[in-house]
């Protein structure tokens, strides 16, 4: 089974948010998009693991600011109590489970069923709200007494001490028992893990101790206690130890009559005390002596192995930014390990990964990718797998730049990319916010389709397509349709066959190009033929001439490129 949907209300940045998940989901988005908040929200209705602890009682800073503002505004405006109560800032996290695979999983979630059994929908919810709505509203009114402007209020003054939480079944409101909830665990490998094994009192010791204690069978614990007793016997047999507890020979009779024979026996400590003295070594060095990236790799490996091995009905493993501090090779190893582990994890393992790395994204099926944008969770679709296959052929293609950059220009090849980057650098405008990406092919339809899934109708996001005509009107019309139907897409095609033809034909460029290459071409067609003979090398020379600040008459851009760049201003 797995968690299919999560609904969040009034938790941190989420005013009203819903996301659909799969057994393996990769979540991407810009900074502050809410990836960490999503993982934290999931921990509220679910059981924490043995390694980390997630508090379920929230603070006022965890409540959505907009919800608090709306509540305050209703009081200031003198709304009726019923309307004010409806606006009380309440945090709700509702989780839907589906697809139980065996009687154990059905036994755990069966009582949470919603609607018809055929739908296989089982829900529980976490609520953080005032215990007494009337008393809460009265307290809030007293707090805002005399205030007439919302700007005079303070969100952190909300009487949070009147709140309480509970985890209930969505179908009948009954509390979820701990015995059921303990079989559904959320396990988080968060992004802030730099202190793992950073010194000789490292966090790795604590984690390893907890892992061992929770995993040891009773028979193993008995063996450890027995071994500890044997270890103590060896200590007791040392000469120094004997001297401490053996009386002076001159007083043997005194001790025989008054004091029983003194012996030392082990004060058997609990397992935590014994196991906490174990530390990790890698090669010939302590783990804390290894590099930060290596420690992060070990951290992910240890925890993910431990989490997926838990004998629960569901293990939800959340991994934040697995790429943190990892080299190219180690990141490849980590992504392979996570991906293959999820494939073999069975129905009890569900994995959520957040990432900023194209290498992690390209490793997985595109249909597993979810883009967080505002209060939306957008699932990428690739029905014909055109983009998935493209990413498999170009594993280093940065799809994040395509999807998340505010201004993106897609071009066919490196020649256009060199030319445009040179112009941008010379003009020094839009350079920091404009991404120029070469797709190394002629068709842009697939890229525009996936870009629109995330950015359709968003005026702050712009995409320009710069393409060659190639004497193909049908293909030109297919691309131009996207320009016509979308205000934030601009498609521009060469007038003639390719870029070189249009560049040579641009007013004044024939003279400029003849001067640059020391040629005497009489027509643009003749110059275009020359440029095509060694495209990359000659475009590089053109780009260098544009970058030369001493050149007061640089090559001019052709009309289709200039219009595509003007659209970005």
Where would I find each of the regions flagged by the language model?
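Extreme N-terminal "head/tail" segments of very large remodeling/mechanoenzyme assemblies
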Residues: 1-26, 30, 42-85, 92-100
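Switch/communication elements of ASCE P-loop NTPase nucleotide-binding domains
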Residues: 1-47, 273-275, 279-401, 478, ...
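Conserved catalytic network of the ASCE P-loop NTPase/AAA+ motor domain
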Residues: 19, 83-88, 117-119, 179-182, ...
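Glycine-rich phosphate-binding loops of NTPases
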Residues: 57-211, 218-223, 485
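Flexible glycine-/small-residue-rich
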Residues: 97, 128, 190-193, 282, ...
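Short helix/loop capping segments that flank catalytic or ligand/cofactor-binding pockets
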Residues: 103-106, 136, 197-200, 289-290, ...
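Extended helical coiled-coil dimerization/tether regions that scaffold
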Residues: 195-316
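Acidic, divalent-metal-binding catalytic cores of TOPRIM
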Residues: 361-569
